Amino acid sequence: MPKVGMQPIRRQQLIEATMAAVNEVGMHEASIAQIAKRAGVSNGIISHYFRDKNGLLEATMRYLIRHLGEAVKQHLAALSVNDPRARLRAIAEGNFDDSQINSAAMKTWLAFWASSMHSPQLYRLQQVNNRRLYSNLCAEFKRCLPREQAQLAAKGMAGLIDGLWLRSALSGEHFNRQEALLIIHNYIEQQLNIKYKC
């Protein structure tokens, strides 16, 4: 019989072990046995909590998405002004939070993106994540721009966030957060200063 209160601890151990395995050997090479060994549990524990490797990957992605949402909320909550520019910058800062740009997280995100093209559950998670980013950006741009301009600006900024992140992940180099934020901040200024004063 499992110990009471162990489920959240075990699940967290397995998620962290999954990210470590993906970081070291990649998603395809990260076997159930290898992940279980890293977590210090039996293979059966993974089946008990997650059904299979796909269930574990889905739980790991939910974990990363939850941390991404929390990072964005924290950056927004830290603002002393309710200014669209500041809020757009905070959204970018949350997307480039340390929880999202460390090696294990970046490689797990890459594996997730690749797997989401072939898994309906992962595809749905990816779409929810994409819509949340777009919606947050669009809401802020709409405070300064007409609807169509705001939608285009939000799509462009989401593309920049994803593109900067992806280029860094594929380069194998450490993510240059300061440089990425400078590029995003310049984009925000260009969008808000073209025709509209905000």
UniProtKB/Swiss-Prot annotation:
Function: Repressor involved in the biosynthesis of the osmoprotectant glycine betaine. It represses transcription of the choline transporter BetT and the genes of BetAB involved in the synthesis of glycine betaine.
Membrane-spanning residues: none
Organism: Yersinia pestis
Record InterPro entries: BetI_C (IPR039538), DNA-bd_HTH_TetR-type_CS (IPR023772), Homeodomain-like_sf (IPR009057), HTH-type_TetR-like_transc_reg (IPR050109), HTH_TetR (IPR001647), Tet_transcr_reg_TetR-rel_C_sf (IPR036271), Tscrpt_rep_BetI (IPR017757)
DNA-binding region(s) in UniProt: 31-50
Stated name of the protein: HTH-type transcriptional regulator BetI
Name of the encoding gene: betI
Keyword Repressor carried by entry: yes
Pathway: Amine and polyamine biosynthesis; betaine biosynthesis via choline pathway [regulation]
SUPFAM superfamilies: Homeodomain-like (SSF46689), Tetracyclin repressor-like, C-terminal domain (SSF48498)
Example GO BP: regulation of DNA-templated transcription
Keyword annotations of the record: DNA-binding, Repressor, Transcription, Transcription regulation
Residue ranges constituting the HTH tetR-type domain according to the UniProt record: 8-68
A GO term for molecular function: DNA-binding transcription factor activity
Highest taxon above the source species: Bacteria
DNA-binding is among the record's keywords: yes
